[in-house]
Design a protein with these regions (language model features):
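Phosphate- and other anionic-substrate recognition elements at nucleic-acid/protein interfaces
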Residues: 1-191
Length: 191
């Protein structure tokens, strides 16, 4: 896998702020070799940042299934040429609309299955531990780890008016570490 070009993606999938990190390469995993795609309902984030981060507005929807389908269609359009994708698993401590989250994710998994795209599920605690060293890391800790690793302060760049790290910054960071974890796992398995 070290010298072979591959296209992989890490998906932080949700109803309110889905984000996909696409990496194409055969060597070291770097931020510059990634492209990020996210959906937002905030117009000022629906644009490109730094040349490799691309935000789009959510599509209009009237019923839940229409919403799930539009998000999954958006994702599959980006993921069609991937050799492998990794999806963050469910947070079993989650509260609220957990069945909506499961239905939404189920639509994506089904569409990826139809496309023949292999999916690996990574538990949220593994993503957090891989990114920050702590399996219970919060958004601030993940952002701090990302800045330390990449030298890029996405919060200051994209959401300078927000007090805390939130969407879309936290979604981009999570998708980055989901993709990087899969890249690392693929390299290890090829040894």
């Amino acid at each position: 896998m070290n010298h072979m070009m591959h296209k992989i993606a890490g998906i932080d999938y949700s109803l309110c702020g889905p984000c996909i990190c696409v990496f194409e390469g055969g060597g070291r995993f770097t931020f510059d070799d990634c492209c990020f795609y996210f959906l937002t309902d905030t117009k000022k984030y629906a644009k490109s940042f730094m040349g490799n981060i691309h935000g789009e507005m959510f599509s209009e929807w009237n019923v839940d299934m229409e919403r799930y389908q539009s998000i999954a269609d958006w994702a599959v359009d980006i993921l069609k040429e991937m050799h492998q994708v990794s999806l963050e698993g469910y947070a079993y401590s989650a509260t609220g609309k957990v069945f909506h989250i499961a239905e939404n994710t189920g639509v994506l998994k089904y569409k990826l299955f139809q496309e023949g795209i292999p999916v690996t599920i990574i538990p949220p605690t593994e993503v957090k531990k891989f990114g920050s060293g702590k399996g219970n890391a919060d958004k601030q800790m993940m952002h701090h780890a990302f800045v330390k690793e990449t030298g890029i302060d996405l919060k200051s760049l994209m959401t300078p008016d927000k007090k805390d790290v939130g969407s879309p910054v936290s979604d981009i960071i999570d998708s980055y570490y989901i993709c990087k974890k899969m890249h690392t796992d693929l390299l290890v398995s090829s040894l």
